[in-house]
Amino acid sequence: MSRRGTAEEKTAKSDPIYRNRLVNMLVNRILKHGKKSLAYQILYRAMKNIQQKTETNPLSVLRQAIRGVTPDIAVKARRVGGSTHQVPVEIGSAQGKALAIRWLLGASRKRPGRNMAFKLSSELVDAAKGSGDAIRKKEETHRMAEANRAFAHFR
């Protein structure tokens, strides 16, 4: 156990246009090689595409997509007596959001298409509707946790 105090949890800053922490978290995950302005550009173009596709508030679509992809439970590898078991573990809201964002971006990067803004907007709209690769990933994680329910006492 650390002799120092516990580290304070950093609160995410909000972005300049939507004034939303979730948007800023997404921008920070899109970010590659320190090019934050490009990450903002990609996300804002994606939001504009969502606005044109759905004719609703893109922020509500984003929230709905992340809420749909956020897992409640995941599996964690735990070594017990020489064999490794996949132990189901409940996930907190912050970690769940982070996983959801990671899965959404991973799924949108894998999509075939012209540019990242287009792929991201398509994935967010699909996730908000309840389909897409990110939703499939969440369901797969939940299935894994359900299949390994017998090892829940190893926590």
UniProtKB/Swiss-Prot annotation:
<dbReference type="GO" id="GO:0009507">
    <property type="term" value="C:chloroplast"/>
</dbReference>
<keyword id="KW-0687">Ribonucleoprotein</keyword>
<dbReference type="InterPro" id="IPR000235">
    <property type="entry name" value="Ribosomal_uS7"/>
</dbReference>
<keyword id="KW-0934">Plastid</keyword>
<comment type="similarity">
    <text>Belongs to the universal ribosomal protein uS7 family.</text>
</comment>
<dbReference type="InterPro" id="IPR036823">
    <property type="entry name" value="Ribosomal_uS7_dom_sf"/>
</dbReference>
<dbReference type="Pfam" id="PF00177">
    <property type="entry name" value="Ribosomal_S7"/>
</dbReference>
<keyword id="KW-0689">Ribosomal protein</keyword>
<keyword id="KW-0694">RNA-binding</keyword>
<dbReference type="InterPro" id="IPR020606">
    <property type="entry name" value="Ribosomal_uS7_CS"/>
</dbReference>
<dbReference type="GO" id="GO:0003735">
    <property type="term" value="F:structural constituent of ribosome"/>
</dbReference>
<dbReference type="InterPro" id="IPR023798">
    <property type="entry name" value="Ribosomal_uS7_dom"/>
</dbReference>
<dbReference type="InterPro" id="IPR005717">
    <property type="entry name" value="Ribosomal_uS7_bac/org-type"/>
</dbReference>
<comment type="function">
    <text>One of the primary rRNA binding proteins, it binds directly to 16S rRNA where it nucleates assembly of the head domain of the 30S subunit.</text>
</comment>
<comment type="subunit">
    <text>Part of the 30S ribosomal subunit.</text>
</comment>
<protein>
    <recommendedName>
        <fullName>Small ribosomal subunit protein uS7cz/uS7cy</fullName>
    </recommendedName>
</protein>
<keyword id="KW-0699">rRNA-binding</keyword>
<dbReference type="GO" id="GO:0006412">
    <property type="term" value="P:translation"/>
</dbReference>
<dbReference type="GO" id="GO:0015935">
    <property type="term" value="C:small ribosomal subunit"/>
</dbReference>
<keyword id="KW-0150">Chloroplast</keyword>
<dbReference type="GO" id="GO:0019843">
    <property type="term" value="F:rRNA binding"/>
</dbReference>
